[in-house]
């Protein structure tokens, strides 16, 4: 997800610190600074420009849609997209949501999409939170320290996990760390976690790799920002579960109709370093939304040239 200065709306951000007045250039620069931890892009090819999803529908059987910038801006569905999604389904297309929302339970996500007018079933939504929770099956049971907001409750969270707040003992006693949302995070807590990892390196699993997210006054710092800082300071390399990393796409692949070739699947999003890079690395085709979200109508050509992450399609709108 992303946003361009001057066209911001409130949305369900799980970030805390706000970069007042920050714009796309700030976010782009920060993503480029952590490219050494991101997947490698495919060899670039010239993208095809089209008007909207209907214009490319004949090429694909499955559409993986990011949420912000594709389905909605803030608490509003993007005009025409509810009908567009319904129309794709009527044409026999499978439509899934693939989102880095990790800070709140699946029930909150589904209620939000319902409120916006979408009719996604539970199996139609794949989140980085789901990917992380599934990934826990590969880890022995332990006492996890949680970077998450207590206000969203304990639904879906592992038994015995402890919310990390201002008590240094909780950081010392945790046997590993889960970063889900940053809305209750602070520089004081970041310093406590950094020191805890230096004193006793432990696993750091990150549900939301986003560095920033849009809010009314600028950009909020998201879990990915804090995770990369922790890695640089402590030497502990995080394990990321959301876009652009493989785990969320592996989970999405389990939901895709059996036998669907990868080149008949398209990842649609507004952000080069998450949606497009991740979809491409997973072997799917990709479509960048130019008219909403990160670019909000600005021409993405300079950014594409600057980072070498090239979508297969550039769409004016979803």
Residue ranges: model-predicted function:
Residues 101:
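Conserved phosphate/oxyanion-binding catalytic-loop motifs
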